[in-house]
Curated annotation (Swiss-Prot):
It comes from Gordonia bronchialis (strain ATCC 25592 / DSM 43247 / BCRC 13721 / JCM 3198 / KCTC 3076 / NBRC 16047 / NCTC 10667). One of its GO terms (biological process) is mycothiol biosynthetic process. Keywords: Acyltransferase, Repeat, Transferase. CDD domains: NAT_SF (cd04301). This is Mycothiol acetyltransferase. 1D-myo-inositol 2-(L-cysteinylamino)-2-deoxy-alpha-D-glucopyranoside binds at residues 44, 188, 230, 238, 276. The keyword Transferase applies. The lineage of its organism: Bacteria, Bacillati, Actinomycetota, Actinomycetes, Mycobacteriales. Its EC number is 2.3.1.189. Belongs to the acetyltransferase family. MshD subfamily.
Length: 308
């Protein structure tokens, strides 16, 4: 299918950066859609990118009725579009016009996809009307930690592993090494640099006691894996990132690190925990389901059918 061109909505603007007024307008639309739908229309990264400076690589598509941003693809990975339409202006063709423009921009450099967070009926219908198909699924899993929830298995650390929490920037190089080895295939998680670590360490939710590091007892300087937890509010925690060095696979480190984080989140008083996992990552799904997680929601990336 050729890249879409043109639009019947001439007020749509494409730019490398947004002015202060447009940043505020985009954030209001995101907040309004989240309140209306019970789920944010944009990911954490896409929300942060709303006020990204020119030169960041992010492209913005904005109109009076909607907003989208385009994150460029890395290597063979597609560009990713995230979009929102003002809830009060839906079903008037604005979503289609916004995505037509966004795909037209994104596909100049290759393949592109658009996230539908929650895969709501309106998003499904819009995707179908544009000839888009499901190309990727990201599952949100949840389990309880509070009263009435299944008890967590005991945390048992093998003598071959040294488990501790984050000790500061001296740990960053090993975290980056393991992260980029574990997620070299991942469009968002792979290819991190020091700025990605600094951004998260500087976030309001960051807690060094919630970042678990597993080192090799025989080589204490070598990181085997890590688990970064996140606390969203007083009730909900998150298994944010679990990364294991591919060279250390098969030692049960994913389960160990996940369990360490779950015990920590339970100790902070969180009553529920969530995580995100690729829909086709059967090994990770099996691990999480054995730890009591169940499916809660789904995000779908829609794109052109393969071969178009």
């Amino acid at each position: 299918m050729p890249a879409p061109t043109g639009t019947d909505h001439p007020d749509i603007t494409v730019t490398d950066s947004l002015g202060e007024h447009d940043v505020a307008r985009a954030r209001l639309m995101v907040d309004g859609a989240a309140a209306a739908d019970g789920i944010s229309p944009l990911s954490e990264q896409a929300v942060a990118a709303i006020d990204a400076a020119a030169g960041s690589g992010v492209r913005h598509v904005i109109s009076a009725a909607g907003y989208a941003n385009i994150s460029p693809g890395r290597g063979d990975e597609p560009a990713m579009i995230e979009a929102v339409v003002d809830p009060q202006l839906r079903r008037r063709g604005h979503g289609r016009a916004l995505l037509t423009t966004a795909f037209g921009e994104a596909e100049r450099a290759g393949d592109a996809r658009v996230w539908a967070h929650g895969d709501l009926p309106g998003a499904q219908a819009l995707a179908a009307s544009m000839g888009l198909v499901r190309r990727r699924e990201l599952l949100q899993l949840r389990r309880g930690l509070g009263t009435g929830a299944p008890a967590l298995p005991e945390l048992i650390v093998d003598d071959s592993v040294r488990l501790r929490t984050y000790a500061g920037s001296a740990d960053d190089a090993e975290i980056l090494r393991v992260n980029n080895a574990a997620f070299d295939w991942h469009p968002e998680q792979g290819g991190w640099g020091a700025e990605q670590i600094a951004e998260r360490v500087g976030a309001a939710w960051f807690d060094p006691e919630g970042l678990f590091l597993a080192f090799d007892a025989a080589n204490p300087e070598r990181l085997l894996g890590f688990h970064w937890t996140k606390q969203h509010d007083t009730e909900l925690g998150e298994v944010y990132i679990v990364g294991v060095d591919p060279a250390a696979q098969g030692r049960g480190l994913g389960r160990l690190l996940t369990l360490a984080g779950l015990h920590h989140l339970a100790a902070t008083g969180r009553s529920e925990v969530n995580l995100y996992v690729e829909g086709d990552n059967t090994a990770a799904l099996h691990t999480y389901e054995r730890l009591g997680f169940g499916r809660y929601a789904i995000d779908v990336a829609y794109g052109r059918p393969e071969g178009d």
